[in-house]
Regions:
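Feature responds to low-complexity, polar/acidic, surface-exposed segments characteristic
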Residues: 18-94, 102-121, 130-141
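Sec-dependent N-terminal signal peptides of Gram-positive bacterial secreted proteins and lipoproteins
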Residues: 2-20
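Soluble non-cytosolic domains of exported or imported proteins
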Residues: 24-28, 53-60, 86-90, 114-122, ...
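Repeat-associated, polar segments at repeat-unit boundaries in modular proteins
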Residues: 123-133, 290-295
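Active-site-flanking segments in enzyme catalytic domains
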Residues: 139-152, 159, 164-302
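Glycine-rich, acidic and aromatic/proline-enriched surface loops and short helix-turn segments
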Residues: 33-36, 40, 68-72, 98-102, ...
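A short alpha-helix/helix-coil micro-patch that ends at or immediately precedes a cysteine
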Residues: 34-38, 70, 157-169
Length: 302
């Protein structure tokens, strides 16, 4: 798994004066502070970006929101965070561990973090200030005012892809642009709203973080799909008509769009390879072996 652990070393934590306890924040109040900190103005209700049921914003939820707002995905294993939405304490643990390592939570709760306690405005602003300057290992181009809150989803997808493939993409000077719909390319052309991701084969990638003024929850799939295009273009496509039974299985398992052309067939097959490898190997062995060969070829070029 790709480790999105920041390599920047925080110097010394600022001395924290003792403040009178102010009341805990609601989720909406906390998200307003985060948006204000980043200079974001939006009509969209951003409280739904986190998996939260409680009206009050806890310290652990605030830590996750702060770190996501800087486009940082701290977990060593993506499944550790996303496997069970019901186990919120487990979801937050990688964010808390990361924040404590980087000094972001120093002084919050008098150094007794107490993750389920409500977060105060002072604590939230202190954590936002301490996180300033920490960058994800792989930078995103922030074209959308909301992408700082949503880019963790894109990084979730990248974290599942082989390290060498992501490394190669960035070593070529490419960038992943977070944007909205419709996607507008550098030449000014506007894509159809059906496109939530786009790649210039000799250039960058664009991924929508919002669709119809609402968060786009499948950025991770779009990231995998576009990196699949990159792999297929750099190696060799597979003629989908040569493997009709395997193609039909992928249509049923994933979506009919994979039959659009051989480029889309490869990219969607790569999504299946990353997300459901055992199923792909069992039901589409030729496709599985082809992607394996392409990955080995790409790795050999590193």
């Amino acid at each position: 798994m790709k480790r999105f652990i920041c390599t920047v070393t925080v110097l010394l934590a600022l001395c924290v004066p003792i403040h009178a306890e102010d009341s805990g924040l609601s989720m909406d109040e906390a998200m307003d502070i985060i948006l204000e900190h980043h200079g974001v103005e939006t009509e969209i209700d951003v409280s739904g970006y986190l998996t939260l049921d409680a009206e009050a914003m806890t310290r652990e939820a605030a830590v996750a929101a702060v770190i996501r707002s800087y486009g940082i995905y701290p977990a060593d294993e993506a499944d550790y965070v996303w496997a069970d939405e019901g186990a919120q304490g487990e979801q937050y643990r990688p964010y808390i561990d990361y924040a404590q390592r980087m000094g972001i939570t120093d002084g919050v709760g008098g150094n007794r973090f107490a993750p389920t306690r409500p977060v105060t405005a002072w604590e939230l602003r202190a954590m936002l200030d301490r996180a300033e300057g920490i960058q994800p290992e792989y930078p995103l181009a922030y074209d959308s005012p909301l992408c700082r809150l949503l880019s963790a989803e894109t990084q979730r997808g990248l974290s599942l892809i082989h390290d060498f493939l992501v490394d190669k993409f960035y070593q070529e000077g490419r960038v992943i642009h977070a944007t909205g719909t419709p996607i507008i390319l550098p030449n000014g052309s506007s894509l159809s709203d059906q496109y939530v991701g786009w790649i210039q084969y000799e250039g960058d990638v664009w991924i929508s973080v919002e669709v119809g003024n609402a968060p786009y929850w499948y950025q991770y799939e779009a990231a995998i799909h576009e990196l699949g295009h990159y792999l297929g273009y750099r190696t060799a496509l597979l003629d989908r008509n040569r493997v009709p039974e395997e193609r039909d299985w992928l249509i049923r398992r994933y979506r009919p769009y994979c039959n659009e052309n051989n480029h889309e067939f490869f990219a969607d097959s790569f999504v299946a390879y990353i997300l459901w490898p055992a199923e792909l190997q069992e039901n589409a062995p030729t496709v599985y072996a082809h992607i394996e060969a392409c990955l080995h070829e790409m790795e050999g070029r590193m």
